[in-house]
Amino acid sequence: MKIRIAARGSKLSRIQVDMLGEKLKKIGIEYEIIDIKTKADLFSTEPLSKLGKGVFEKEVNEAVLEGKADIAVHSMKDILSEINPSLEIFAVLERDPPYDILIAEKNLDKLDSNITIGTSSIRRKNFLKYIKPEINTKDIRGNVDTRIRKYLSKEYQGLILAEASLKRLNMTMNYHRLNVYDFTPEANQGIIVALGRKKDEKIKEIFKEINHKDTLDEALAERAVISLVGGGCHSPIGVLFKKEGKEFYGIASYSDGKKKITVSISKPGDPYTIGSELGLLLKKEMKNEDIIP
């Protein structure tokens, strides 16, 4: 059997598909890749905030819905909190490091004033502005290779990226991992997800064999927070859960650049209930501080 996998055509996306494909091969399933151009690819110089929601996923998911592919593979942080009702999460791979990293000559505490850090994430911009208001941020688009090239050419004095992307690309640059209390990661950062048609029971059963249950539980808890509070790649909300045994450890943060709220939770239970509880805690504190997302 050969499974058709739809994904973006970027180098990082190809690597992510191959990571999932290797899991399939181990259970005797072959795969082929169907390259899809998304809105984010077609307007690669535009700020993400101007492109709307779902810019990394919509066209890829449509290929599955239209029967041109069996599975859509994404970096899970790029998919909306509300998935198309005809699609379903079939599997996630074991999570890579979920952290944000700073690529710069110095660590965050020792950065000079009035330098320019490259990031297109409103979450990262606001967290940085809260901690280091004297540092400038500037939008940066393009794949990871392009962004690093701009940094090396001194167009930027630093970059904030996801650690998982450097790991998957096998890049060996020096970087500084950012503390999760200062830079709480985007929901589902570091997770590769496979989406399929809800009615496709045969393929759904195949993907159960490669699903990493603890990672999925972490992902669902984080998505419950975002569903309650509102968020995604255009929102200054970070959330991270770690599951150890039956215990969930969660942290969620919001910043408008002037104020910052961080809440946490630690308890056993099911992902949706615990994620919702953390989301309600965050909403309550945001209301107390008169912050509206």
Swiss-Prot record:
Swiss-Prot/TrEMBL catalytic activity: 4 porphobilinogen + H2O = hydroxymethylbilane + 4 NH4(+)
Q: What else is known?
A: The porphobilinogen subunits are added to the dipyrromethane group.
Its source organism is Saccharolobus islandicus (strain L.S.2.15 / Lassen #1) (Sulfolobus islandicus)
**Homology family:** Belongs to the HMBS family.
Q: Which Gene3D superfamilies match?
A: Periplasmic binding protein-like II (3.40.190.10), Porphobilinogen deaminase, C-terminal domain (3.30.160.40)
Q: Which cofactor does it need?
A: dipyrromethane
Catalytic activity, EC:
2.5.1.61
GO BP terms: namely: protoporphyrinogen IX biosynthetic process
Q: What is the protein named?
A: Probable porphobilinogen deaminase
Q: How is the cofactor bound?
A: Binds 1 dipyrromethane group covalently.
A cellular component annotation (GO) from this entry: cytoplasm
